[in-house]
Amino acid sequence: LRDGRGLQSAPASAPPTYAVTAPSTPTPARPSRPDLRSRFARLDGCMLADRGRLAARLARLRDSGRDDPQELAAIDAALDASAARVAARRARVPVPAYPEDLPVSEKRRTIQDALRDHQVVIVCGETGSGKTTQLPKLCLELGRGVTGMIGHTQPRRIAARTVAGRIAQELGSPLGELVGYKVRFNDVTGDEPLVKLMTDGILLAETVNDRQLRAYDTIIVDEAHERSLNIDFLLG
């Protein structure tokens, strides 16, 4: 009773609150993703013929979002094998000598600068100037023929055999080792030739199984002015 005016209830107290926490469970550490970026960078040191296949395997592994130690180990082994093959080929590159009396020898620095700076180079010169025999040697000196062969086409079989023999002789190598040739019914190439002479028809036929001709890092189309059907297809 307060002042006779009625009952007044005491202010209700707030209910007690309790904080309930569950025991903390440590979040399992997510396994680290394999370092694919460094493996993609290693492709530059592989054979051209291996790069596309290995890049596709790495891309599939990256896009899957999963860790596959077995596949990663297989890719690493393939990268190592391809890089070792490149190193072995580089160690076999000879130091070429050039006959001083040939016009191509006199202009070799100019030609090499053009080869270094441009994807496609047209070399014109008189018959006997040394284009056919010296261009592959110029390419070898630039470091070509290592990640793939230097392909060198001739319009006729006899020319392919003769030129291969001459270049091999100038490099001081038995025919079929550093320099080989392939014509119809006859293949004289060792396991790891740096330069391969062939008819233009042979090279064109290889596009069936190697559409981008990744077996080669350089291709020389000799006698291109003859403009045969095979040569036109190759240039295209």
What are the language-model segments listed below?
Residues 1-19:
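N-terminal amphipathic/basic-hydrophobic helices that include classical n-h-c signal peptides
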Residues 3, 25-28, 171:
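Coiled-coil-like amphipathic alpha-helices with heptad-repeat character
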Residues 6, 68-69, 150, 223:
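Intrinsically disordered, low-complexity regions enriched for glutamine and histidine
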Residues 7-10, 43-46, 156:
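Hydrophobic transmembrane signal anchors and adjacent membrane-proximal interface regions, especially
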Residues 16-113, 117:
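Helicase-associated low-complexity/disordered flanking segments
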Residues 114, 121-236:
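Conserved P-loop/Walker A NTP-binding site and adjacent catalytic elements of P-loop NTPases
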